[in-house]
């Protein structure tokens, strides 16, 4: 079996991934900007956000790798980075976020999503790496990955999957560790309503794949 790097050399993505390699249409840019402004106001007034360590972020591209407690986590991380919502993509479960055309269209208006199969296979992971590479090569863009693979119920850290480390090594980009504090109290897994409360994002030192 070929290594991931060998498989990537001549890998061609299907047309369904074209959205990752081009500038979003005007409607998408407007929706992302409106969503970003809404989030800025929301996390200033209702769930005040504190940011620690933003100056540690390296030049793009990089992988922002964080614990995962809530559906609000991606917005928190993008705001903490401060480079704009369109400069990030999130890894998203293919069987949930991409199995419905309406859901896929709606969510991609607000954020960039890269599909990945929950069940690992060499072929599906090569496809994911190729899609990620295309996105990261288009302007100053970065990736958000949650190494636990799911949201925590109580804020406790779960076991890590190896995916983020493989992406960093195969694409030659650093991992920036981050820790989100408080989001599991504001919007816990399984709840519809968001509770008011403070949240904080701690950003750590980047880790380079050759270190």
Where are these regions (language model features)?
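Soluble catalytic domains of membrane acyltransferases
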Residues: 45-211
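A transmembrane-helix-recognition feature enriched in membrane-embedded lipid enzymes
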Residues: 3-52, 100-113
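N-terminal short leaders/motifs
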Residues: 1-16, 147-159
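Serine/threonine-rich low-complexity intrinsically disordered regions
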Residues: 1-3, 24-25, 121, 208-209
């Amino acid at each position: 079996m070929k290594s991931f790097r060998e498989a990537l050399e001549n890998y061609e993505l299907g047309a369904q991934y074209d959205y990752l390699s081009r500038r979003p249409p005007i409607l998408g840019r407007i929706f992302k900007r409106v969503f970003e402004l809404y989030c800025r106001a929301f996390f200033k007034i209702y769930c005040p956000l504190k940011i620690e360590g933003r100056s540690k972020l390296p030049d793009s591209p990089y992988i922002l790798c964080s614990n995962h407690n809530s559906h609000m986590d991606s917005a928190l991380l993008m705001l903490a980075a401060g480079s704009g919502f369109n400069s990030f993509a999130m890894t998203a479960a293919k069987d949930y976020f991409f199995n419905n055309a309406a859901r896929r269209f709606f969510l991609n208006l607000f954020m960039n999503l890269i599909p990945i199969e929950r069940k690992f296979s060499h072929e599906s992971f090569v496809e994911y790496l190729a899609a990620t590479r295309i996105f990261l090569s288009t302007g100053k863009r970065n990736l958000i990955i949650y190494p636990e693979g799911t949201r925590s119920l109580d804020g406790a850290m779960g076991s890590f999957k190896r995916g983020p480390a493989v992406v960093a090594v195969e694409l030659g980009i650093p991992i920036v560790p981050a820790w989100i504090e408080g989001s599991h109290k504001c919007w816990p897994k399984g709840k519809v309503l968001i509770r008011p409360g403070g949240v904080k994002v701690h950003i750590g030192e980047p880790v380079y794949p050759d270190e």
